[in-house]
């Protein structure tokens, strides 16, 4: 028959707000559970990526509440920064007006989705009450030498007209607008995240349930390398060039060395060269290239012979010194030793420029003709006293020991991670609370004067320089130290600074005296469950981890990690790319709220595939979830009308067995974030209920009420509106009290969790009966993993009553 979703959903959304659903009392004696979805950029409407995120989060919130937890699940807005400002520019509306209008709209859409949050804790990064404390934390970092201003080659986006952090550049393009990024030398503000390289890497092992791919992405970005550092003297001078290598075992194979065009000795090298014109031209050309262009594997490497020689310290041989733009000044020492026999990039370079190639490692100790670099392990040759040693480890350790003994080198660890560039030449951001005084230099604003307010200006387009530099009343100020005339910093902060600590502010959103209370922070953090997109693995998640460690060392908090458990949802793609406002390919939920209802949309997001997988959006499946809810509506009403009996028959016993199996499987699947299988299990039970109703016209009242209450409670976290309405209409209760418990007498030793793997990795699971066959297990796998092409399966490994693994 169906139901009026518009009327029902509005009714329950109003009820949850009126009854303070989602409001958390931090002082409750219940076990705490901090459940947090990443807060959004309010730069447009909610899209399906948001809907997926907030549906997952709401399922966890409602489930944990019914399991007796004191759940904190707040919501706020990442409302400063490029996304909001660019959207405002496109619409011709001032960023503040645009942002606050979008916040109002997006909040309404979240409520229409049926998600419950503690709106009493709502925060917005652009609010003075919030960015006052962002500025205070910046000053704390500055006073503890964790924030500094310095010259550096930086990534510049001509379209966004601002500097970008390395993490915001994807394959040489701006992550926001896809414009080519080029290099500029500018004086910018940085956070010393590199100081925490070791700890950020080592403490990945202390995290709870984090996806391996996220930890791997952070590990690779931090990029720890172990090796040796030594000096190569420039012949006939007192100058030395330091080089770092991860392959000390190849040091006898050096046939040339390379420095970056920006190397600290580049001027001296040019002066020594007889090839000044070509060198200067090459240096000038390199300055116009982006880092991506310089490192791209697609382009042939270029360089210029300086005509200068350097000495290999291990054997005294002189080799040519080249300049090449594939060497970056801020990686390692800005100089490399080149061993073409055992590095493919060096091999290609040497072949191109006809440089000697000397083999020092061979497969079996015998020399051979090399048509490409030999990079495998082997035996050292042409290496004097080290001949015969095994590469890499044995020979490297011996050569490092010799370098140290001779006083010409040392073992060293280096990291790819560089300091976090936070300066932005944009208007819509948190002002950096620093002042430059002619006498005192850089001076932080006094805490009592915070916030340094972002002025209301109409001309916020930055045609040249920072927009705030044009505002005299903002720029001109007094030095806090000496009182003389001074000027304010006119860059604003990267919006990722705002989001690096927002999860702390939720605990004290209205405090004017402090950003957070350390006692409460230590009680409630780290966040028990964090939910958001995998695309934030390097940016937001790494920055937040740094922030917590820095604030700990300053003495403001005691914790060392912000998020104990992380669920990284897959992206919603549309038209082949991630659905996002910046790409203009969003699909708004409002039409579906109107046509099918929020519950149908929620269920479809949960049913479309494993939530960790990225999926291509199409709306065909939402018809199916709406039909399912219509059947639930009809079945529950029919069941409530079945006349009562004094005892249960075999059909009722079987229905109760099916119900308890479903309780067990749904509970297990929620705990394991396997939401797509929950929907399958609920659909299966609803079909069993339909069959039961066709065959039976009476049922014991206790059993009837148990089936209605427990079935609806299982559905409630996923589709809360219709579940609440059916509970109210049929059992006279407006709220679910507790999560259903399995009655073991119905399922004792009858079921187990079938693990479904693809290439040895768990992709799904299902509660099934003992003795389930391989054929049935395969059928379940096809049902739960529709995105897998089972025609590609090469081998099936089936272990009775345990797992099935498909090798593709």
Question: Across the structure, where does each feature detected by a protein language model lie?
Answer:
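N-terminal catalytic cores of NTP/NDP-binding nucleotidyl/phosphoryl-transfer enzymes
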Residues: 25-95, 122-137, 245-246, 313-349, ...
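Helix-rich, typically C-terminal accessory recognition domains appended to large enzymatic cores
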Residues: 78, 143-155, 159, 250, ...
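Conserved oxyanion/phosphate-binding beta-strand-loop segments in alpha/beta enzyme cores
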Residues: 1-36, 65-74, 98-105, 209, ...
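Amphipathic alpha-helical
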Residues: 194, 199-224, 260-304, 450-478, ...
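Basic, alpha-helical terminal appendages of large translation-related enzymes
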Residues: 1-32, 260, 272-277, 307, ...
């Amino acid at each position: 028959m169906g139901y009026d979703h518009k009327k029902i959903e509005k009714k329950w959304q109003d009820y949850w707000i009126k009854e303070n659903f989602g409001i958390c009392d931090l002082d409750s004696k219940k076990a705490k559970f901090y459940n947090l979805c990443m807060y959004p950029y309010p730069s447009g409407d909610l899209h399906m990526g948001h809907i997926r995120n907030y549906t997952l989060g709401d399922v966890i919130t409602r489930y944990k509440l019914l399991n007796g937890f004191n759940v904190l699940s707040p919501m706020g807005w990442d409302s400063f920064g490029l996304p909001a400002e660019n959207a405002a520019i496109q619409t011709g509306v001032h960023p503040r007006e645009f942002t606050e209008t979008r916040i109002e709209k997006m909040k309404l859409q979240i409520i229409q989705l049926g998600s419950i949050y503690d709106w009493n804790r709502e925060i917005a990064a652009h609010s003075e009450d919030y960015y006052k404390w962002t500025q205070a934390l910046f000053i704390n970092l500055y006073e503890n030498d964790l924030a500094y201003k310095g010259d550096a080659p930086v990534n510049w986006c001509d379209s966004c007209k601002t500097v970008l952090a390395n993490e915001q550049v994807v394959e040489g393009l701006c992550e926001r607008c896809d414009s080519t990024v080029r290099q500029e030398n500018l004086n910018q503000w940085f956070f010393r995240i590199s100081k925490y390289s070791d700890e950020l890497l080592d403490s990945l092992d202390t995290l709870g349930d984090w996806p391996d791919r996220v930890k791997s992405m952070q590990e690779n970005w931090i990029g720890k390398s172990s090796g040796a550092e030594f000096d190569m003297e420039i012949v006939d001078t007192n100058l030395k060039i330091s080089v770092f290598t991860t392959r000390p075992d190849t040091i006898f194979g050096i046939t040339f060395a390379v420095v970056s065009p920006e190397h600290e000795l580049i001027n001296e090298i040019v002066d020594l060269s007889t090839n000044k014109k070509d060198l200067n031209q090459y240096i000038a050309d390199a300055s116009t290239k982006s880092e991506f262009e310089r490192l791209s594997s697609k382009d042939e490497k270029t360089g210029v012979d300086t005509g200068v020689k350097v000495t290999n310290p291990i054997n005294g041989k002189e080799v040519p010194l080249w300049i090449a733009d594939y060497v970056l000044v801020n990686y390692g020492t800005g100089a490399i030793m080149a061993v073409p026999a055992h590095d493919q990039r060096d091999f290609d370079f040497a072949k191109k420029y006809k440089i000697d190639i000397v083999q020092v490692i061979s497969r079996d100790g015998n020399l051979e003709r090399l048509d490409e670099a030999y990079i495998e392990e082997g035996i050292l040759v042409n290496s004097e006293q080290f001949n015969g040693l095994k590469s890499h480890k044995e020979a490297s350790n011996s050569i490092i020991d010799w370098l140290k003994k001779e006083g010409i080198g040392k073992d060293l660890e280096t990291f790819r991670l560089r300091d976090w560039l936070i300066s932005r030449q944009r208007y819509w951001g948190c002002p950096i609370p620093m002042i430059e005084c002619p006498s005192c230099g850089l001076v932080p604003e006094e805490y009592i004067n915070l916030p340094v307010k972002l002025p209301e200006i109409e001309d916020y387009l930055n045609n040249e320089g920072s927009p705030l530099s044009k505002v005299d009343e903002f720029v001109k100020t007094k030095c806090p130290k000496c009182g003389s005339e001074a000027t304010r910093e006119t860059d604003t902060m990267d919006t990722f600074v705002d989001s690096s600590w927002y999860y702390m502010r939720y605990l004290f959103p209205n405090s004017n005296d402090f950003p957070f209370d350390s006692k409460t922070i230590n009680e409630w953090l780290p966040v028990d469950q964090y939910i958001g997109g995998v695309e934030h693995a390097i940016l937001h998640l790494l920055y937040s981890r740094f922030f917590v460690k820095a604030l700990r060392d300053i003495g403001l908090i005691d914790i060392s990690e912000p998020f104990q458990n992380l669920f990284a949802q897959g992206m919603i793609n549309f038209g082949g790319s991630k659905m996002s406002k910046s790409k203009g390919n969003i699909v708004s939920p409002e039409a579906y709220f109107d046509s099918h209802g929020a519950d149908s949309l929620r269920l479809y997001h949960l049913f479309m595939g494993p939530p960790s997988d990225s999926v291509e959006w199409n709306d065909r499946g939402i018809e199916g979830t709406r039909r399912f809810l219509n059947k639930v509506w009809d079945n529950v009403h029919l069941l409530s009308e079945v006349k009562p009996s004094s005892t249960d028959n075999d059909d009722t016993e079987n229905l109760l067995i099916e119900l308890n199996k479903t309780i067990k499987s749904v509970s297990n699947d929620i705990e394991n974030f396997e939401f797509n299988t929950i929907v399958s299990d609920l659909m299966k039970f609803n079909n069993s209920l339909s069959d039961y109703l066709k065959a039976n016209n009476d049922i014991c009242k206790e059993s009837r009420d148990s089936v209605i209450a427990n079935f609806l409670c299982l559905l409630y976290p996923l589709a809360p509106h219709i579940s609440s309405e059916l509970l109210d209409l049929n059992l006279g209760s407006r709220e679910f009290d507790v999560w259903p418990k399995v009655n073991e007498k119905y399922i004792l030793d009858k079921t187990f969790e079938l693990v479904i793997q693809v290439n040895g990795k768990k992709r799904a699971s299902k509660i099934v009966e003992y003795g389930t066959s391989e054929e049935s297990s395969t059928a379940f796998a096809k049902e739960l993993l529709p995105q897998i092409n089972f025609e590609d399966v090469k081998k099936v490994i089936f272990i009775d009553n345990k797992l099935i693994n498909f090798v593709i």
